[in-house]
């Protein structure tokens, strides 16, 4: 079942494109990109979420990430 979001597809796609452009501009390899994005997620959780909710949010984010991974062999 698809998730319902309060954000439009256009908003999400525009922000995603801008973030990807920054990574491409810096010629960031995949491992560096993942490290930076992971640090960004950690920073957002630690600075924007109440301490009592941080672990639950991190677990929810991790589950959403794992469920969105495509397991086909192409890359």
Swiss-Prot record:
It comes from the Bacteria. InterPro entries: UPF0352, YejL_sf. Coiled coil: none annotated. Pfam families: DUF1414. HAMAP family: UPF0352. Belongs to the UPF0352 family. This is UPF0352 protein YejL. The gene is yejL.
